[in-house]
């Protein structure tokens, strides 16, 4: 582990040299959060003992106070995430992190939780077509996010609104949900679990490839290694065919995160979470995601679900403390996609077209 510890220390030293505005968005906002709590050096993959002397960057906690923006009081873990995402190449990780901090500053990500999507009917339409929600927590306290991949249509608002909503969920997760469970369990919890429901996945999903790619690029480059495990459930043939060609292109680290479960995955998921935390589409075979989430408080995709009610109310409250709320989406610049990820998207698109031809669809997009 000495090499990994050395990489963390090198990256910390490089980050200590960035411009003050970038350093601020990585660190803390003292006037918002209070004063002078020390950071914890996180035990990650047995690195804790080796990291005891990594003090150059982390001693800044005495100046800036308790956790705020990017690292939430766990800078070691954050540096490790960027290093893992770049296969432990320090210079590449530094470039990635600096680019991410620039992206946050240029797009005002630190204040995105002060910018509600209004009117509420528009936000409800987004929730009905961008299916994601917090279904509960694992037995170890890790947040479980459910994603309705197959039935998300992204067709009721502009790309900008969907990207804004996705980033708001990311930021709320990182600033509030994860710190809350960290405090509850007395140990750092900095990642989540995602259960991806493939119910309804068809070749017509090719139409949503652009927006899905935009959202995944935002995640890959600015929220790396935030998902501990991906569980795939209710997978139709089209997913299996695409997974077969995509899997060899993924880094081994990523492949190990993906678990394709039988059917709705209920039995396997109950080994790591209680029934109350199971996404609604995993509770019985054939349940699947609901295409329209409105009016169902048990459906974690719905605006009526406690998670989305809490999130939307919080953003509205924060906005009241700012200037007059303005209608219109927040335009967030999508970072340039990593070449390796772009190749994977090309492979998926090619496989979709191939399957379309095999199924006799002239346009290659209409069959299940």
Regions found by a protein language model. Give the residues of each.
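Basic, amphipathic alpha-helical/coil surface patches used to engage anionic, phosphate-bearing ligands
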Residues: 1-368
